[in-house]
Amino acid sequence: MKYTVDAASKVEVIATATLHGAMKTLFPKLSGTLEGDPAALADTAKAVVRLSMADYDSGDRMRDWKMKKELDPDKWPEAVFTLGKIEGVKRTGDRLEGKATGLLEYRGRKVTLTAEASGTLGDTEARAEARFKLNLNDVGVPPPKFLFLKVHEIVEIVVHLVAKPAQV
């Protein structure tokens, strides 16, 4: 079954910094398609997900201003993830779990990522969550610095996908 990514989807970036605990930034604008048969997910899974880099909210106006300078969304408006494979698929009721590997393209760079993923594929909706670590330097983003605050280069990414059946 083929699905279209819904507006309820979001990406959370969780960063840590010197003199500071975890800081979350929410990126709420995703688009793309998911495809798969729950009975044979390892063989049928496909996905292309696009993330707008211009729309985000950290809950701190100064941090958002600094991030805009680092991300430069006018020059680099989106990041694109293309699923390559899902391995080790386990099913518990309607819930599927496995390792998703794919290619993240951003700022002219390509990074292979592997994430712990789980979700459901139903007739009316698909939901998935994936979690992985990313080194900001790998995608050409210098870890932000502001006064005494320096963000560590390794961040945790949590992707929450909601998708509806694609219109034929």
Residue ranges and their predicted role:
Residues 1-168:
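Low-complexity, acidic/polar, glycine-enriched regions of mature
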